[in-house]
Swiss-Prot record:
It is found in: Cytoplasm. It catalyses: guanosine(37) in tRNA + S-adenosyl-L-methionine = N(1)-methylguanosine(37) in tRNA + S-adenosyl-L-homocysteine + H(+). One of its GO terms (molecular function) is tRNA (guanine(37)-N1)-methyltransferase activity. The gene is trmD. GO terms for cellular component: cytosol. InterPro entries: Alpha/beta_knot_MTases, tRNA_m1G_MeTrfase_C_sf, tRNA_m1G_MeTrfase_TrmD, tRNA_m1G_MTases_N, tRNA_MeTrfase_TRMD/TRM10. This is tRNA (guanine-N(1)-)-methyltransferase. The lineage of its organism: Bacteria, Pseudomonadati, Pseudomonadota, Gammaproteobacteria, Alteromonadales. GO terms for biological process: tRNA N1-guanine methylation. The keyword Chaperone does not apply. The keyword Methyltransferase applies. It comes from Shewanella halifaxensis (strain HAW-EB4).
Length: 248
């Protein structure tokens, strides 16, 4: 997968290219990431990339010309039709479903805003989609872009050691992940659930599914509203609720 990032702080993306899952993906050639700095497309000695907004008001906006030229350079480097994404709190909220949609693209150009944002005409003429990682304000689009890159790259074939790792992640099936345990078997009086030590794969599968359903009900009940549960899932969830009531 090819990713181009338009940013005033390209050095921030070493966190993506040099570390962890994404770093390994880059080193294996499964993920290619290039950056373009609008400052490199300026025509004045100060490398100015911001300007005052028409109508007044606080803050500055990113200038049109350097940003647009950087986007064009990124699209040209893609060598194919690349989808241009602007990271914005006004965009569609990124969910696992959205991540799966984006992962189907072979190339993406991510535009990271700074200051008070970008000229609306850039969005109208250069941007295909706007995406948000949540209803809060950040200093720029770099962290949202890195979040998007990390989540999308996990779905690129070969990036994770086992595809099952991606399939078992929270939200991969619309549910939160189940609890996980490793050694020791007992920690400060808290024991690993016996079913996980049983070696019975079917019992373990059902326990994990039930815990995933129950955790979603307790922590993110709105997620269940959008799911059509199977008969097995409904039974496991009902048993989970009964167990909670008995414990109370």
């Amino acid at each position: 997968m090819w990713l181009g990032v338009v940013t005033l702080f390209p050095e921030m993306f070493r966190a993506v290219t040099d570390f962890g899952v994404t770093g390994r993906a880059v080193s294996k050639g499964l993920l290619e990431l290039q950056t373009w700095n609008p400052r490199d497309f300026t025509h004045d000695k100060h490398k100015t990339v911001d300007d005052r907004p028409y109508g007044g008001g606080p803050g500055m906006l990113m200038m049109v010309q350097p940003l647009r030229d950087a986007i064009h350079a990124a699209k040209a480097a893609a060598g194919k039709e690349a989808k241009v994404i602007y990271l914005s709190p006004q965009g569609r909220k990124l969910t696992q479903q959205g991540v799966e949609e984006l992962a189907k693209s072979s190339s993406l150009v991510l535009v990271c805003g700074r200051y008070e944002g970008v000229d609306e005409r850039i969005i109208q003429t250069e941007v295909d989609e706007e995406w948000s990682i949540g209803d809060y304000v950040l200093s720029g689009g770099e962290l949202p872009a890195m979040t998007l890159i990390d989540s999308v790259s996990r779905l690129v074939p070969g990036v994770l050691g086992k595809q099952a790792s991606a399939e078992q992640d929270s939200f991969s099936d619309g549910l939160l992940d189940c609890p996980h345990y490793t050694r020791p078997e007992s920690l400060d009086g808290l024991d690993v659930p016996a079913v996980l030590l049983s070696g019975n794969h079917e019992h373990i599968r059902r326990w994990r599914l039930q815990q995933s359903l129950g955790r979603t009900l307790l922590r993110r009940p709105e997620l269940l509203e959008n799911l059509a549960l199977t008969g097995e899932q409904e039974k496991l969830l009902a048993d989970f609720v009964d167990t909670i009531k008995q414990d109370d």
